[in-house]
C-alpha cells in the first residue's frame, strides 16, 4: 500500500474516532433525558438483572465522572457513573444493562474475555514501552529493538481486536435482557439500542486507528 494512502486512511480514522467520541456523549445525553415508563433507576435495573442471573454477590456501586461506567472483575462490582446510577432514563438503563452483561460474561467464563485477560499484561506493558523500544531502535540503528517495539504495539492492537466481540456481546446480552424481562419497549428499547450502538462504534474507531498506526510502523521500518 502506498504510504500516502496509509496516511490518508489514518487521518480519516482519527476523524472518525473524534466523531464517535462526540456522538456517544451526545447520544447518551439525549436519551438520558428520556424517562422509562418503568420508573426504576438504572442501579435498580442492574440489580434486578444480576439477581435474575444468580449473581447476588456482584455489587452495584456509584463512581464519579460521565460515561465512566464499568465492571471490575477484581472487586466483582458493577460501577455506574453519577449520571447513570440514579437515572430512570432509557439511556442510563441501557448503559447499566451493558455493564451487567460484562459481569455475566465473567460468570460464564466467556471465551473472548479469557483471551483478553491473557493478553492484558502484555498490552499494558506495551502501551508504555513500545515507543521506547521503537525510538531506541532508530537512535542506535538496531532493527531488533524496533521489531520489539512493533511487536508490543501489535499486542495492543490484538487486545483492542479481542475487545470488539466482548463489547458487542455485552450489548447484545443487555438488549436481549431488556426485551425479555420487559424492562423497555418500543421507542424506549430503540433509544437504548442507539445508545449502546454509539458506544460500540468508539471501540471500532479505536481499533481502526491502532491498526493503521501499526501498518504505518511496519511500513516505516521496512523503508528504513
Label the model's feature ranges:
Residues 132, 147, 207-211:
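A hydrophobic membrane-anchoring feature enriched in long, contiguous, low-charge segments
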Residues 1-27, 137, 143-144, 148, ...:
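Hydrophobic alpha-helical transmembrane segments of small proteolipidic membrane proteins, enriched
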Residues 10, 124-127, 131, 150-153:
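Residues within membrane-spanning alpha-helices of integral membrane proteins
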Residues 1-2, 41, 126, 142:
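Serine/threonine-rich low-complexity intrinsically disordered regions
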Residues 120-142:
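Post-HExxH zinc-binding segment in Zn-dependent metallohydrolases
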Residues 21-123, 127, 158-224:
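Polar-ligand-bearing catalytic/cofactor-coordination segments
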